Each structure stands twice: as C-alpha cells, then as structure tokens.
C-alpha cells in the first residue's frame, strides 16, 4: 500500500465511522454496515465518490431519486430530501453537472423552496436545465405502478441519459410489489414508484448508488440475505399487512451506502468527493445545513415522528449541523495537511499492517 492509498483509506474509514455513529444505541446501523462493507470491500463513502469522479463530466445529468411519505400526516419526511438538495449543490460545484430531483409530487414545494437556499434555479423542463447555468431540475413521479412504468420509459426515451442515478432514503417495493414503513405498515398508496425508474437505469448500465438506513429503501436488496436475517420486519411474513413479503426492498444497486441516517450517508459521500477532488467548497457548511433543514420543515416536511420542528430521523438540527461540521473538519484537515507526517507514514507502512 502506498502513502496516498493509506490516506484515502483512512479518510474513508473516518467518514464511514461518522455516518454510522449510533446515539440511539440499538445497533441497526452497525448491522447494516457489516453487510454493506462486506459487499463493497472498501469504505462506502470513498467508493461512491470515486465512482462519481470516474464517470461524471461537465454538463452531465445526474438523477437524484428521493422522497418518502409518512403516516399519519401523509407528509414527506426530512431524511433523504435535505441531503438530496445539498447533494445537488455539491454536484454543480464539483462537476458543473445538471442535477435532477425525481420525487413524489408531495415534495415539489419543498424542492422549490430549498433550491433557492442552495442557490440554484429550478426547472421542470430539462432542456432549460441543460442550457442554463446554476440550474437543477425536478420531475414529480407517479404513485400509480402502471403509469410509473410508462413515465420511466418516457423519461429515458425523451431525455439524454444521466451519467449517474443516486437514490437517497427512497421507498422500494418488496418482492410482492408493496411498500412499507420501518415497522412493517403498508404505505403503497402513498409512495411514488421511483424504484421502477432506478432499476431501468441500472439495467442500461448507468452508474447507480443507493443510500439507505434500514432495508426498505431502493437498492437494499443488494444485501438481502443479511438484512432478512438481522433486521426486524424485513424477512418474509414479518410485515404487518397481508402481502407476506416483509419490508425489504427487492431492488438492487451496484453501489450502496448504509448509515444511521440516510442523509448522513449522503453527507459522507459528499465529504469524500470534496476530499478526493481536493476542493473543500464541494462540501456544505453547518449553517447551510441548518438553513436547508429550516426551509424544508417550513415547506411541510416532517421528522420521522411527524413533527414539523426541524429534525432528521429524530436528530435535531444541532446534531445534524455537528455531523456536517465534523465531517467537514476531517476533510479540511486532510486537504490542508497533505504532505505532512511523512516520517510517520513511512514508519507505519514499513511495519506491514497495511
């Protein structure tokens, strides 16, 4: 292993560890990480960022699929949506790419309001997105499975294919075609069927990355056996409806990230992107994190418990801001101190552990 390889490995380990901090303490994030790390073979954050760098070029579309509707208010949750908006900003900063949010119509006003906060113009016409600077797109996606099939084909046939598709905290149908919340309740009627589009793009060889924090999200079928064995409600006949399929999403992804909170997994990928490109501006500030969370909550997005107080998966704005700041500080230190500690690198590598 070279010094550079060790630096990259350790930054990935740091970011993976941060996104899997477990203040709640019941350990699901560690279970998922064990499976996703075994599948990936290296730090998840660095892997995803590296794949993006290898394929994304200036002007490329990148589809960001997100949006999970929760009971009892039938409102979109914060997790997934907040990081999707901040990821859109990062992709413009890193590549001058053209991000397109694909989500339930319920999320449209939040996307509109948050786009202003991150400094991007929002268009539904992708021709405008492609030709205009500092712009992003939105495509509201159908909740009807039959119409979703047609819409997915239409999106693929009528637009330039994206360089990548990234799903963040997006519900995925189980093997019976049903969508569930974390505790096994059926939410099929509420959810956009965006996993249909994700899978079609994957079949076409588009770079695909899926981020989840439980197993009911798009792409988590990649580690199906692991999730079915260890995650509650995931196995067959363990959900609370009559479908008998469990909450595990059947869809698979070539690259996955699992974390305590899906947004934290996305932030880890974004921080890794900033590190690999040696450009700290790619990663957002704690202040922008708080601003987007506030805009999202004022647009009707809820915490997982249904509250309109800004929070993501039960974690307050303060905790999310601290997470962003700590990830950012790790990356900044790594970039600013590259080339230092040469003696220690040489000595450590000489011992043969790495």
Please tell me what each predicted stretch does.
Residues 1-61:
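Positively charged, low-complexity intrinsically disordered leader regions
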Residues 7-8, 260-263, 280-354:
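C-terminal accessory domains and tails appended to enzymatic cores
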Residues 73-76, 175-189:
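Glycine/threonine-rich flexible loop motifs
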Residues 77-96:
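Histidine-anchored nucleotide/phosphate-binding helix
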Residues 96-97, 202-208:
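A short helix->loop->beta-strand "cap" motif at the edges of active sites that frequently abuts
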Residues 98-106:
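Short internal beta-strands
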Residues 188-195, 207, 211-290:
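Short alpha-helices
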């Amino acid at each position: 292993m070279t010094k550079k390889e060790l630096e990259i490995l350790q930054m990935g380990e740091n970011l993976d560890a941060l996104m899997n901090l477990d203040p709640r303490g019941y350990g699901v994030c560690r279970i998922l990480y064990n499976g996703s790390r075994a599948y990936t073979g290296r730090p998840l954050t660095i892997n995803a960022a590296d794949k993006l760098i290898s394929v994304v070029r200036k002007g490329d579309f990148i589809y960001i699929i997100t949006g999970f509707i929760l009971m009892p208010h039938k409102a979109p949750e914060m997790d997934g949506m907040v990081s999707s908006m901040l990821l859109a900003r990062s992709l413009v900063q890193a590549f001058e790419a053209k991000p397109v949010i694909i989500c339930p119509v319920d999320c449209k006003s939040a996307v509109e309001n948050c786009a202003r906060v991150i400094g991007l113009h929002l268009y539904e016409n992708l021709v405008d997105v492609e030709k205009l600077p500092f712009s992003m797109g939105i495509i509201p996606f159908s909740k009807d499975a039959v119409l979703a099939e047609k819409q997915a084909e239409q999106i693929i046939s009528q637009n330039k294919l994206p360089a990548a598709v990234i799903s963040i905290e997006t519900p995925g149908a189980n093997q019976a075609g049903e969508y569930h919340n974390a505790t096994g309740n059926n939410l099929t009627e509420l959810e956009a069927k965006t996993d249909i589009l994700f899978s079609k793009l994957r079949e076409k060889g588009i770079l695909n990355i899926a981020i989840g924090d439980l197993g009911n999200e798009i792409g988590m079928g990649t580690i199906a056996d692991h999730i079915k064995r260890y995650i509650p409600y995931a196995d067959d006949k363990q959900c609370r409806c009559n479908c008998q399929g469990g909450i595990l999403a059947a869809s698979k992804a070539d690259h996955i990230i699992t974390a305590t909170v899906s947004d934290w997994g996305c932030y880890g990928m974004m921080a890794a992107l900033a590190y690999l490109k040696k450009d700290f501006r790619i990663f957002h500030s704690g202040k922008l994190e708080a601003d987007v969370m506030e805009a999202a909550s004022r647009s009707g997005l809820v915490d997982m418990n249904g509250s309109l107080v800004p929070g993501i998966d039960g974690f307050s704005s303060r905790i999310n801001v601290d997470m962003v700041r700590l990830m950012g500080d790790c990356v900044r230190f790594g970039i600013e101190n590259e080339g230092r500690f040469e003696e220690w690198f040489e000595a450590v590598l000489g011992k043969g552990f790495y």
